[in-house]
Amino acid sequence: MSNLRPEGVPVNFDGSDRHFIFTIKVIDDLQYMHPATGIFKMIEEAGKDTLEGLLYLVDIVYALCDGSVTRTDIMQSLKTNTLQGGGSLQTVRSAIDLALVESMPEPTDEDIPVREDASGIIETPKFLIIAMARFGYSETEAWNLTLRKFSLLNDAYMTINGMKKAEDDYMPLSMLP
């Protein structure tokens, strides 16, 4: 999968093939639904076998499906598949975890860190403004960026404009033993 054209993580939990991907819009939607809880905390809770965890899981799937299915349908699908031994609950949780990992910047990216504030909220408006002003994306395009793609674009922009030194992909001869 290309970092600039992420496909998302394929998952089938309700009879439909879907691709889960954490775009800026998905993160913002989740933070709107749960304003006091950061995205990483929501996903951690969704992995637990508690009522609160299941509610977070339903909201996360709802946001990842962009509202194309109702929360009731998601809950019913998870309940039916789990009771029939399909292992759907764990499949969906694994897909969510993988989608988050694939959508976030590499841990070494330092220019635009994905930091949460004290409450654990990622500042999505900052990413939208930069994507529209600096990169010329429309609002719709900016909402559909992953934070990983945003980070790659920002690194390239900063390097091209001399704001950041280009990282060499090779080892100079003087560093060889």
PLM features per residue range, with description:
Residues 1-177:
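Charged interaction scaffolds used for protein-protein
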